[in-house]
């Protein structure tokens, strides 16, 4: 991956919180955790050079999503090298969803966003997922159809970049592929490399 710059972990923590603050599923927990930590301004007007703010954001992410060793982050490696850049279309196509039942089933078992639309069209979803609803995939894709940029997915990878797994940004990446927008949009991302990433339960 060319053109990626080194990034600091506080950037990634902020990007994760920003990505989920308006989430239908996780937004309430994230906003509550931010308010308890210091306030929504931790995301809305961050000072990434402030150690106090960075600690507060980590505290909020821990409360909302388990950073950095529980819930979503169970088994997450301590040592991660972070980078930031733009994912090219062929790189986007290599990114898989996390190993979680919802995303596994939505993609027909492959964990690949490119398989979501064929799975939806074929009606191959289990009843429990159908009840949750899938119209959001098309609604979000329609919203992105007028966009030019999608900001800051968070992708985890082995050091050789042989395996790429999405940590944050599942709805955005799904909508990109459902809308066939992967070759039109500019998609930025944080990329985390770790020799121990395969111990993460969702990898």
Task: Indicate where each model-derived feature is located.
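Short, flexible beta-strand-to-coil junctions
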Residues: 1, 154-163, 191-196
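Intrinsically disordered, low-structural-confidence terminal and linker regions
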Residues: 1-47
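Short alpha-helix boundary/capping and kink motifs at helix termini
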Residues: 36, 40-46, 52-88, 93-167
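A sequence-level detector for short glycine-anchored, His/Arg-bearing signature motifs
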Residues: 163-178
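Active-site catalytic pocket residues across diverse enzymes, especially alpha/beta-hydrolases
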Residues: 179-183
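Amphipathic, charge-rich alpha-helical segments that serve as recognition/docking helices
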Residues: 195-203
């Amino acid at each position: 991956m060319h053109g990626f710059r080194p990034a600091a972990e506080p950037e990634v923590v902020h990007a994760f919180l920003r990505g989920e603050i308006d989430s239908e599923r996780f937004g309430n927990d994230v906003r509550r955790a931010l308010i308890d930590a210091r306030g929504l301004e931790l995301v809305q007007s961050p000072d990434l050079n402030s150690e106090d703010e960075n600690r507060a954001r980590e505290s909020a992410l821990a409360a909302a999503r388990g950073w950095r060793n529980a819930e979503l982050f169970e088994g997450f490696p301590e040592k991660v090298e972070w980078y930031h850049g733009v994912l090219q279309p062929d790189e986007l196509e290599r990114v898989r969803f996390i190993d979680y039942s919802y995303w596994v089933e939505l993609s027909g078992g492959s964990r690949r966003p490119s398989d979501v639309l064929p799975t939806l069209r074929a009606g191959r979803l289990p009843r429990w997922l159908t009840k949750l609803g899938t119209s959001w995939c098309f609604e979000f894709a329609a919203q992105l159809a007028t966009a030019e940029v999608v900001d800051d997915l968070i992708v985890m990878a082995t050091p050789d970049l042989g395996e790429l797994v999405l940590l944050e940004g599942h709805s955005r990446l799904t909508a990109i592929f459902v809308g066939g927008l992967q070759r039109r949009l500019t998609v930025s991302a944080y990329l985390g490399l770790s020799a121990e990433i395969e111990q993460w339960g969702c990898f």
